[in-house]
Amino acid sequence: MRIVHAAHYSLTRDGTEFFNCEFKFHTGLCQAGHYVYPFSINDRARANIFGSKTFGKGFSNTCLLACCKNVEPDLLLLGHAQYIKPETLRLLRQVHPRMKIALWYVDPVYAPHDYGHLFPKLPYLDALFVTTGGEHLDQFRKTPCRVAFIPNPADSNLERLNLDEDHSKKAYDLVYIGSDKNRHERRSFLEELIQKSDGLRLGFAACMNQPPVWGEAKDHLLRKSLMALNLSDRNDIALYSSDRVVQLTGNGLCTFSAASSGLQALYEPDQEMVFFDSLDDLVVKAKRLSQRPDEACAIGRAGRIKTHQRYSGKAIGDFMCTFVMNGTRSSSPWPQ
């Protein structure tokens, strides 16, 4: 197919966000045999004398209309697309009646997060893909737009560290990368983890008064750890996780997630991922595996293989295209 992928490519960031989902979906769709034209929503919005996205919203919408006129895609795939107006989608429907329109969304779809901009777009979408499962999908099922769960995408050229191959020279037993700014519950959890760690070597970035890390600096931190902790804003939302989960599992780290997340539907417990019921349970399991690095690496290896086989950008791209064009979930290697 010929696809216009309109998302926040953030080309002005000079590669600091090279690991974002936009690029993984783009590459995966190309690997699946499609032609993909990139349209960077935010960068087009900033293309004004003030460099302001707010002032440039209208311009970005005008540019998207022109882009679809020039490319004549079979599919317009939107990523988040906060700045794309429903009126723009209505016009695109009118001018390109044979073109399918779909949108993927990888942020939370529960309060207090701001995702209200999705609802006015639904009447003009053929499909909506979100990285949340269960009952939270029901709120979008009030129009003919079809809705489906997708996992966060991985890319073997990005998540390529293969950290399960060598457990020597590790500075940390368990590392956590994620912000605790204005996240009091997360901060309290991490503080209690430190108090109860009792010999566990813990590493932090972007939290616990440690600076954030990006790009190679983040990879360097991961290389120094045997295991990693995957936390989301809420850990009781069916199948939801930030894309941190594939950055950890895809690189071969033995990854810990809350059992309440439901990620057991994607990863086999104690074989591909370790699940904990409480902070005390996390500490017990992390301590045990820190003393059994071969077992930790075996879990990391199995998780890495599952991530790249089942949840690659290509696999998810294949599913999205089949779903939006044919309305079928038959190619889905994950539960719906």
PLM segments and residue spans:
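A short, histidine- and acid-enriched strand-loop-helix "catalytic/donor-clamping" loop
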Residues: 99-114
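Nucleotide-sugar donor-binding catalytic core of glycosyltransferases
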Residues: 1-51, 71, 80-87, 119, ...
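Glycosyltransferases and closely related glycan-assembly transferases
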Residues: 65-76, 85-101, 141-143
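Short acidic active-site motifs
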Residues: 63, 88, 113, 117, ...
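Conserved acidic donor-binding segment of nucleotide-sugar-dependent glycosyltransferases
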Residues: 273-279, 288-293
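A charged, aromatic-enriched C-terminal amphipathic alpha-helix characteristic of glycosyltransferases
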Residues: 32, 291-324
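Short hydrophobic patches on amphipathic alpha-helices
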Residues: 68-69, 92-93, 122, 222, ...
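Glycine-rich, highly charged phosphate/nucleotide-binding loops
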Residues: 50-69, 84
